[in-house]
């Protein structure tokens, strides 16, 4: 395997792992938020605020993975 093949595989692995984990986290956050709102509808604004913040933090991991993959690919 030459260096370009290794870079390609490293880029693919980084993107795969870096997007699967946040997707699972966002799904779990959404399901738990829906459960919480279903049990206590009056707390919906607080739950939604916390949910959006948690989703933003989870999505940041995917953005970091994208940046790392681009560095691997082009540097």
Positions of PLM-derived features:
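Hydrophobic alpha-helical transmembrane segments of small proteolipidic membrane proteins, enriched
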Residues: 1-75
């Amino acid at each position: 395997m030459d260096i370009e093949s290794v870079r390609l595989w490293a880029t693919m692995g980084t993107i795969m792992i870096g997007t699967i984990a946040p997707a699972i986290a966002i799904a779990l956050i959404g399901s738990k938020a829906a459960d919480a709102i279903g049990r206590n509808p009056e707390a919906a604004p607080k739950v939604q605020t916390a949910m959006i913040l948690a989703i933003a933090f989870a999505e940041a991991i995917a953005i970091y993975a994208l940046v790392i993959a681009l560095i691997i690919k082009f540097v």
